[in-house]
Structure formats: structure tokens, C-alpha cells
Amino acid sequence: MIDEKNQAKIEHAVREILSAVGEDPDRPGLVETPARVARMYAEVFATKTAAPFDNYKLFKVEHPTEMVLLKDIPFYSMCEHHLLPFFGTVQVAYVPQHEQVIGLSKIPRLIDYCSQQPNVQERLTVSIATELQRILDPAGIAVSITARHMCMEMRGVSKPGVHTESSYYSGQFKTDLDLKREFLQRIAK
């Protein structure tokens, strides 16, 4: 959580930005905006002040499946270049080993943890896989992200609706082309 000193710094900076773009930060519609933005940053950048992700439980499974797949997990993050949102869906698959699996709800929580900081999509993709590898040590991981970036839609090239895709594969997903193909076919449905 952002402490009071840094909260005040953010509020001051937002007032300065509003003034610099020709707004009156004391007018009725904007007077509370600096505090709102500071609270919003505390929320969307929560990982920067959080402890390492440890909100998970592993379960022993005598006969684990070949692949565990979670599809269409929504996420949002903030582009580190423009501090504008990017958002979309994540597909995560892993091949269990050591007869253990992770609680299913923990993967979306892990995605939230990795995305709540200034980011680029490519690093977010790898971060999700790296954290899952650290926690679970599976035989392979596949992560695919499809996202829309407001820094491309609202400014610069101004192309609404463009989707950016990124992926990361490790272990069996990298060496077993049939497994990788199965992952890609299943996420395409």
C-alpha cells in the first residue's frame, strides 16, 4: 500500500499536471481528482509495495492430467511507457509434476499480482510463467495473452480495437510440439 507521504506526492503531481494542461484543479469537478488518482494508483500498482505472492495452496494428486488449462482470464495493467491501461485475457496451461496441482482460483490471483504494476505485455507474459514455475515447478508452462492497449488506441497511431498477442512456453510445451499444438487448438475454441 502507498504510504501517506507518497499519497501526498501523487496528489501534488496530479494537481501540477491539471494546471499544466490548462485546468483549474480547484474547480468543483476536479477538486477531489488528485486524491482519487492517488487512491487509484495505490490499487493498480499494489504489487510494487506488496510482499512476494504467497496466496496459494498446492494439492497432491496421485494421477495428474497431462495438461491443466485455464482460459479467458480477464486482466488489466498499466503501460509503463504512458501510464495508460492495457487489458485483455490470459490463457494459462501447465503440465503437473511431483503429483501436485495448484488451487484453480490461485492462477487468476497470480495474474492480478503480476499485472498490478507498471508493465509491458511481453514482461507480464513471462512474469506469470516465472511465478507459476517458482510456486509449482511443473513439467511445462504455456501462457498466452491477448490485449488492447490504450496507448495505441487513444494516442499516437490511434488505432482502436487492435489486439496484441504474446506467448511464452517452457518445458514440455517447448519440446513437445503435439502438446503445444493441443494448447493452441484448445485456446482457439
Swiss-Prot record:
Pathway(s) the chain acts in: Cofactor biosynthesis; 7,8-dihydroneopterin triphosphate biosynthesis; 7,8-dihydroneopterin triphosphate from GTP: step 1/1
Keyword GTP-binding carried by entry: yes
Keyword Hydrolase: yes
A single Gene Ontology CC term: cytoplasm
An annotated GO BP: tetrahydrobiopterin biosynthetic process
Catalytic reaction(s) noted: GTP + H2O = 7,8-dihydroneopterin 3'-triphosphate + formate + H(+)
Binding site for Zn(2+): C79, H82, C151
Example GO molecular function: GTP binding
UniProt cross-references to PROSITE patterns, sorted A to Z: GTP_CYCLOHYDROL_1_1
Keywords: GTP-binding, Hydrolase, Metal-binding, Nucleotide-binding, One-carbon metabolism, Zinc
Protein EC: 3.5.4.16
Family statement drawn from the similarity comment of this UniProt entry: Belongs to the GTP cyclohydrolase I family.
UniProt subunit comment: Toroid-shaped homodecamer, composed of two pentamers of five dimers.
HAMAP family: FolE
Protein name: GTP cyclohydrolase 1
Provenance organism: Lactiplantibacillus plantarum (strain ATCC BAA-793 / NCIMB 8826 / WCFS1) (Lactobacillus plantarum)
Gene name of the encoded protein: folE
